[in-house]
Curated annotation (Swiss-Prot):
Function, as annotated: Essential component of the cytosolic iron-sulfur (Fe/S) protein assembly machinery. Required for the maturation of extramitochondrial Fe/S proteins.
Name of protein: Probable cytosolic iron-sulfur protein assembly protein 1
Residues spanning the membrane: none
The entry's keywords: Cytoplasm, Nucleus, Repeat, WD repeat
Length: 333
């Protein structure tokens, strides 16, 4: 029977921890209501650096590493995005230079809820309470950003954005109970599909890490996790997506975060504090394991699989309202 083992509980923040991300060098970044961004070595669990908390006036809601780099984006409730970077030597014992603030991106009119890099690191997507998604083109150094598209078809607060790992597709999740799929159409980003079915805010979504299927999982205020599948892509402006399945009911309250692992597992967590692992079988999706009180009596805001290190060791990271980041080992057997 699969199970979860807590490897380390890191008391990193004085208030809610909202977001975590780990780069390919094993450096974890965290963002919090206390406005601080902390960098932690996932191997030693040691804090490497605390970034200047004067960069943001309010909550740091989302952090995301640019792929294959030492450049970090952080989105804040002060409606700005900060970009941080370190030289090519990266985070090692010999490099004692501080991470620099490279840029501040402005444009949104309200709280930023999520930031996400495209798989090639050329584009940064941001979403906000102002109901919009912005797409920015970044230079190689992470110092210059040009807005190339503003997407305004959601009718409410946009909670989350995520890019497909290889295709030019972006998914956005919203308080309007929908997920929208966007694609690059002749250098102009267009909404090619609206995924309807959830009966509450869609807090998070994630694409399957597969080269054969284009599928998306989503988690909602209605307590469900759903799977969506691309059925038809005419190559132009519209795509046909279907709701493939609703995963077995395992949450009693809102699902805040979902994440699809390279091995095919889906992890979800949320307001009830549960960490749930799902597995696809020949007969459909099953609940592989449930861990109660992931952060004690506090809500769990985010879950993320870690692709760093040995392929034989599967790690999960959760962030909670207690200000802690918990590192878990997932045992498939």
């Amino acid at each position: 029977m699969a199970g979860l083992k807590l490897l380390k509980s890191l008391a990193l923040h004085d208030d809610k921890c909202w977001s975590v991300d780990v780069n390919n060098g094993g450096i974890m970044a965290t963002g919090s209501t206390d406005r601080k961004i902390k960098l932690v070595d996932i191997r030693s669990f040691q804090i490497i650096e605390e970034l200047d908390d004067t960069a943001h006036k309010k909550t740091v809601r989302s952090v995301a590493w640019r792929p294959h780099s030492n450049i970090l984006a952080a989105g804040s409730f002060d409606s700005t995005v900060s970009i941080w970077g370190k030289d090519d030597d990266g985070y090692n014992d010999e490099n004692d230079l501080e991470t620099e603030l490279l840029a501040i991106i402005e444009g949104h009119e309200n709280e930023i809820k999520c930031v996400a890099w495209s798989h090639d690191g050329e584009l940064l997507a941001t979403c906000s309470r102002d109901k919009s998604v912005w797409i920015w083109e970044a230079d190689e150094m992470g110092e210059e950003f040009e807005c190339i598209s503003v997407l305004q078809e959601h009718s409410q607060d946009v909670k989350h954005v995520i890019w497909h790992q290889s295709l030019p597709l972006l998914a956005s999740s919203s308080y309007d109970d929908t997920v929208r799929i966007w694609k690059d159409c002749d250098d102009d980003w267009e909404c090619c599909a609206v995924l309807n079915g959830h009966e509450g805010t869609v807090w998070s979504s994630d694409f399957e890490k597969s080269n054969s299927n284009v599928r998306l999982c989503s988690g909602s205020d209605d307590g469900t996790v759903r799977i969506w599948c691309l059925e038809d892509d005419n190559g132009e402006y519209e795509q046909e997506w279907i709701q493939e399945s609703i995963l077995p009911k395992a949450h009693t309250r809102a699902v805040y975060s979902v994440n699809w692992s390279p091995k095919g597992y889906i992890a979800s967590t949320g307001s009830d504090g549960r960490l749930v692992i799902y597995k696809e079988s020949e007969d459909g999706w099953i609940v592989e394991c449930i861990h109660e009180l992931t952060h004690g009596v506090y809500e769990t805001n985010m879950v993320k699989w870690v692709e760093y290190g040995s392929k034989d060791v599967i790690l999960l990271i959760t962030a909670g309202d207690d200000g802690h980041v918990n590192v878990w080992k997932f045992d498939e057997n």
